[in-house]
Each structure stands twice: as C-alpha cells, then as structure tokens.
Regions:
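Cytosolic regulatory regions of ion transport systems
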Residues: 1-129
Length: 129
C-alpha cells in the first residue's frame, strides 16, 4: 500500500490515494459549493499545495502560533493549511502513537497553539504556480 511505499523508499511527497478521492467526492455530495474549491485545486492551471521554508514567513527564534503563519501567508497571497516539522519527517504513525507521527505533517492545526519551529521546518500553503 502507499504507506508502505513511503516508508520503504523514504518518499518525501504527498500521494493522492483512493481514500482522498473518496473523501473529496463525499464532501462534494454533501455540499455542492465545494466542487468549485476542489476544481481549483485539481485543474492544472489552479492553485497547488506547496511545502515552503517556514523562514519565508516568520522568524523562528521565538514560539509562533498558526494564526501568525496564516497572516504571513496571506500577505504573500497564499493560504496556509498546515506545517511540517522536519524532526518528525521520518516517523510514521506505525512507529509511535502521536499527532506528530504523520511524517511531521500537521494539517489544520489549532491556531492558538504555540510551536517552536526550526529553520528546517516547512509551511504547507495553497498558492498559484
């Protein structure tokens, strides 16, 4: 399965699986207005998901909450949707039971929680090419 491929080959990208496609279709079935959002994400000329250096957005010498990252991304006409903590990037959920164990990827984090980011961490954003 995809999870095993990621672990064995140390793949450092997102994989679009049947589970994600099923989730998208279920969301559109419940709310037709979401179709436009997903269309923007999935057409070649639409916005894309990028992992960009956290240092492009904030100074990492202090604790930062996600709200600050959202505002910083907004100034660049991007939408912050999460972040990746590099120190957890090689840890899968099979190895430990922890929210940070998803290869360091945190999507839709609590905006008021403060995090100590390192220079190696990334912000996950929606942005036009």
């Amino acid at each position: 399965n995809n999870h095993d491929l990621i672990q064995n080959d140390e793949v450092d990208d997102f994989i679009l699986s049947e589970k994600i496609i099923s989730s998208v279709l279920a969301q559109i079935a419940e709310n037709k207005k979401l179709a436009d959002v997903f269309r923007e994400l999935f057409v070649p000329e639409g916005s894309e998901i990028y992992l960009k250096p956290i240092t492009n957005y904030v100074n990492v010498n202090k604790k930062i909450n996600f709200y600050e990252l959202v505002e910083s991304a907004k100034l660049k006409k991007e939408i912050a949707i999460g972040y990746r903590l590099e120190m957890y990037s090689r840890i899968s959920s099979n190895k430990i039971n922890n929210k940070l164990a998803n290869f360091g990827i945190i999507l839709n984090p609590y905006k008021n929680d403060y995090v100590d980011f390192s220079e190696e961490d990334s912000l996950i954003v929606l942005s036009e090419n």
